[in-house]
UniProtKB/Swiss-Prot annotation:
This is Gas vesicle protein A. PANTHER family: GAS VESICLE PROTEIN A1, GAS VESICLE STRUCTURAL PROTEIN 2-RELATED. Pfam families: Gas_vesicle. Gas vesicles are hollow, gas filled proteinaceous nanostructures found in some microorganisms. During planktonic growth they allow positioning of the organism at a favorable depth for light or nutrient acquisition. GvpA forms the protein shell. Keywords: Gas vesicle. The gene is gvpA. Belongs to the gas vesicle GvpA family. GO terms for molecular function: structural molecule activity. It comes from Bradyrhizobium sp. (strain ORS 278).
Length: 70
């Protein structure tokens, strides 16, 4: 079975569709210090996904509110 490489370029719409379908998480921590004195610290978590994708994975790890049984 031969491996085929695709040399066709992706359009921006295809890239955005794939990112929204699969999701991307960026976790960053930046600290700026001068002579051992911390001047600024920035912590950021960025999630890029469609609402459907986020809800699917958020429910799997328990981040969504569970409906109460009435």
């Amino acid at each position: 079975m031969a491996i085929e490489k695709s040399i066709a370029s992706s359009s921006i719409a295809e890239v955005i569709d794939r990112v929204l379908d699969k999701g991307v998480v960026i976790d960053a921590f930046v600290r700026v210090a001068l002579v051992g004195i911390e001047l600024i610290a920035i912590e950021a978590r960025v999630v890029i996904a469609s609402v459907e994708t986020w809800l699917k994975y958020a429910e799997a790890i328990g981040l969504t509110a569970q409906p109460s049984a009435a």
